[in-house]
C-alpha cells in the first residue's frame, strides 16, 4: 500500500479527533508512568496500514484499546490477525479493555509484563 503523506496525515488527524474517553485515559496513564506516547501511529504490515491507538516508541510497543465490539467473534479474529501482523514487524502489542485503560495499575501491569517478557 502506498499512501501519500498527506492522506496518512488526514487519516491520523481524523482518528485523533475521535479519541474515546478510554483511549484518553490510557494515554494519560502511559504518560504518568513516564512513557513517551505517540497517538495513532501508522504501522505498515505487508500491504496493510494500521493506525495504532497508542505507540510507546521506547518499548516498541503498541497499546490497543478494545471497546465492546472488539469482543465479538468476528472482531476478535480481525484483532488477532492485526496483532500477529504487527508482531511480525517487530512490535509488541498490549490490548486493554475500556475498563482497564482507565486503571493506571492495570496499564502498568500489562506494560510490565511486556517489558519482562521481551527484555532487550
Give, region by region, the residue ranges found by the protein language model.
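Nucleic-acid endo/exonuclease domains
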Residues: 1-120
